Amino acid sequence: MIGKEQENNAELNQSSIIDVTEETPPEVVAAGYRTATGDSPTVLYRTSAPLMVDQMNTHSISIPNQTNRSQQIIDITRGLHVNETNDNGLNDYIPETAPFGDVGQNPSADGLKDVLVEHRELFIKSTSEEDPLLMEVRRGYVLVDSITIIRFSGDDLHSPLSIKFVDEEGVDLGGLRREFWSLLLHNISHSCYVTGKPGRQTFQSNYLEKKKKTFFHLGQLIALSIIQDGPGLPIFSDIVTDYIINGQTSVINPDDLPDGLKDALEKMQNSASDRDAKEAYSSIMDIATDIGFIVPITSFTKKHVKPLQAAFIESQISSCKDELNQFIEGLDTHQVMSLLRQPENRASARSLFSGRVKPITVGKFRKLLKFKYAEGNANQDQRATGIGFLTFLQATKGRATEINGIKLELKDVMMWLTGSTIIPAIGFHKLIDVDFADSTFVNTCALALTLKTQPDLSSEDAVSYYTELIINSQTFTKE
């Protein structure tokens, strides 16, 4: 009797499932309920629906992959639109997004220099100079080594930072520290921790590194960079910079998107008809689904393009929000983040994180140089040599400083002279002294350049001489 009753119950359950599938309108099934007596819906929670033993075994074996899951979502949303009279259409209401626009390139952080210097004096103990926070790193593994060191240096972050490169001579009087920060910036922007096109990057979601609090320690490093001769981390897109500085999005810039995706969306926006927009949408529907934009092809219109753009741009935050928040938490080491978020500091602080900082110009770089000409007979020879070097600086704006396909830029000259490709957030402690002698050499710690006196060198030869000298130096790296 018991066996017969179980068999009858099984048949009844199977009949109920068939009834829902065959008789209930598809839009009702997709919404998660079926019609009961009268007009009241009876909720059917899918997770508690009865499953036969064979069905359970099948589910345990056939776990759908990401593509299948995406297809199931697409099928469900498509089902909502099979009936054109359906009142639950997804495109009945299209929410507004943040305004689209362009904040423009960010100016330098010159306005923050004095504020940051004062802040450093409050938190970095000058009395600890004999026992600094020593980071001894391998030149080719700056990022890995520095994160390893800072994980175990939480109690030593108030000490002045001192850098030593393994197997290299040199005492850090400022130059090695600036060089370290430049190498760290380069390493981070080319690491597995970030994604996106250069100058428009965001963090890459990374479960293991998040659990290890790596992004928190990255934030700590950048906080130290900002107040100890570094440039910050100017690599992020506009929307990520907004989030770091303001905690929210103010303007959405399509230029934050990868070029291919940006072009596809522009083509969609400029479509002559909804039909053409649907066709363009079909080529990116899978990645749209991955970021949570669920609209079936049959329902897509040109009105959906702006929200779709916004969804892709905002995913630069939503896809890695935990990593970003962890980074921001680390940035508040020595209350640096709190300082930068003060209303009067926010505009200048953008340049410490935005990948759109205006590059230094030859004119501004020239103002960093202080030529020290001798009196008497040597004066004219030194001035002629100085003119040759200034001609070389001007030539970096064109193709004259290219050798064998390798292009030397002004930032490379700055790295050679100062150890930094970007002016530090707190600025340089002095101008770069330019002296003259029998050979050319630099002292990045002292911010001093000595030029070989060569009054008879032609302009063309001067450009070639300094170009070859810097390209063959230890500080030059070709991306």
Give names to the regions the model predicted.
Residues 1-110, 115-122, 213-214, 462-465, ...:
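Phospho-regulated scaffold assembly regions enriched in serine/threonine/proline and acidic residues
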Residues 122-145, 240-479:
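C-terminal catalytic/scaffold cores in eukaryotic proteins
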Residues 7-10, 26-27, 72, 170-173, ...:
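Eukaryotic short linear interaction motifs
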Residues 1, 168, 172-173, 219-239, ...:
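Extended amphipathic alpha-helical scaffold segments
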Residues 14, 148, 175-178, 199, ...:
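Short coil/turn segments at secondary-structure boundaries
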Residues 65-68, 236, 255:
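Long, low-complexity intrinsically disordered regions
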Residues 86-227, 232-236, 248-253:
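Hydrophobic, conserved cores of late-appearing folded domains
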